[in-house]
Amino acid sequence: MQFSAMTMNMFVPGNDDPGDDNRIIDMALAQSIWLAELGYHVWFTDHHFRGPWHSNPMQFAAYVAPLIPRDRYMGFGVLSIPFYHPVRLVESMNLLDQLTKGKVLFGVGSGWQGTEPNGLGVDPEAHASGRLAEETLDVMERLWGFKYGDPECSFSVGSHSGRIKRRIMPAPYSRPYPTIIRVATREAGIVRAAQKGWPVFVGVLGADLREQMQLYRRALDETNHPQDVKDNCLRWCSYDWVGVTVAATDEEALEREKLARAETMAIRGSFIQRHGKMDGPVMKATPGQSTADAYAKGGDMKATIAGTPDTIAAKVKQLADMGINHLHLRFLGEWDGETRHICKTSAELFAKEVLPRFAEAQPSRPPAMAAAH
């Protein structure tokens, strides 16, 4: 099983002082290296107007790459692809794929509603529907497949358009393009990802994990992809948004989880009070409830596990038995706050006591990512 950890979790700045940005960036860098040295693949968010390093996560990852062990992957959870010009996005992904020899996992999706699409000039309705993400991904596939001699490739998606006559440079290291992990919350999206040969995020934000995993496996079995493509899909099929707290006893872990959640919600509430509503990655909990309201109430922290290493390992075993091979972990606790020790202890205990029980042999180089078209 593969284990990834999110740098600084869903960071919200405790204060909005530009003079503090460098300290936070250095903190995120140090934590990324520390997590990788503990044994985790490191992941970064892609957000705007709410944190000093994840407004350009690919540039941040390019700096991190040579500083972490060579067998670690980096990932993005997720790149908000409607916010990018498709040509620039494919160029950046290809270059990072080349620099890391394929050791980057590009989670892709729509991103958040509200401030971000408004600030980036993206139509909020088209963005919220998910249509722009699908259209952008279609254009990206066309760009990856374009070669010399092909007819001119023109496209228009959202506010972005282009016309190319030459291939995208550099080409990706992986074939036919870098490893994509697709956010798919609906059945149609899960089936489409399997048909494309893409891993997916399953169980996102309270969805039925077992049901989604069974659907994905059935859809993957019905494809004609080579076995190595199917294996790669299952290797990186990811259970996302798992909040983890590990301690010496179950009781202590549950108490620490409460403390960590309380500080996160206090910081989030303060930010909302100062800057207005903040949309987040949560589905509407009740009819008529906005994502901003749900996020303000902690709707993104429903999937949590807390306990001793043995308790945590038992829960991980249940997930492994469902066919989950990649856990995307968020160790609860504010790294820039009073509950940093909770995050630190959890990550260290998990790495020492849980991770070795599910270790798998790492390939000397990542398998080429190939999908049938």
Segments predicted by a language model, with ranges:
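Conserved, mostly hydrophobic/aromatic
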Residues: 3, 35, 47, 64, ...
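Glycine-rich, proline-tolerant flexible connector loops at the mouths of alpha/beta enzymes
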Residues: 42-63, 80, 204-206, 330-344
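Alpha-helix-loop-beta-strand connector modules within alpha/beta enzyme cores
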Residues: 54-76, 132, 344-364
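An alpha-helical appendage that flanks or caps ligand/catalytic pockets
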Residues: 5-7, 126-169, 209-325, 359-373
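N-terminal beta1-alpha1-beta2 module of alpha/beta enzyme domains
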Residues: 1-76, 177, 368-373
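Flexible, glycine-rich active-site loops centered on histidine and acidic residues
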Residues: 1-21, 82-155, 199-208, 258
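Active-site mouth loops of central-metabolism enzymes
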Residues: 9-26, 77-87, 174-185, 244-247, ...
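Hydrophobic faces of well-ordered beta-strands that scaffold small-molecule active sites
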Residues: 3-7, 42-45, 72-77, 104-108, ...
